[in-house]
Amino acid sequence: MIRKLRIAVDHGNKNMKTCNQVFTTALITQDKKPARGEEYIFYEGKYYLLSNRRIPYQRDKTEDERFFVLTLFAIVKELKKYPQIAPEDVLQINLPIGLPPKHFADLCEKYECYFKGENKVHEIITEGGTYHVAIHDVMAFPQDYAAMMTVIDKLQDIPKS
């Protein structure tokens, strides 16, 4: 069965954030399966684990695969909230992402293409099961735009200098 879900991800320099999860932007890659009880994903022949040693600042997070893999971690963490997902389900993910307003004009299209990829189905094996994920649509927005819209009236009253 094809299931459509929207999972928003904020790719911070310190933390990855979803509606329900926050974790450090840190990743370990290894060839061997991790010890029992460790949270991991197995993707394209490699095991990935989260770490506390964060990735140094990257203005452009599309330079290598690390932030893509961290995004898969974020998606999987959110999918664990849906017990009705069956192993044979294909999950079409709409992925809203936030970009710093300062970088939005330069990186918006690049980020959308990077995270959408080739629109293929990614098989992600975790300690808890297997997911088949297709990142169907990616929409980049300036970070904090939605939060700002909730107080726009107050912002308009602030004197400009």
Regions from the PLM with identified roles:
Residues 1-160:
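Nucleotide/phosphate-binding catalytic cleft detector across ATP-hydrolyzing
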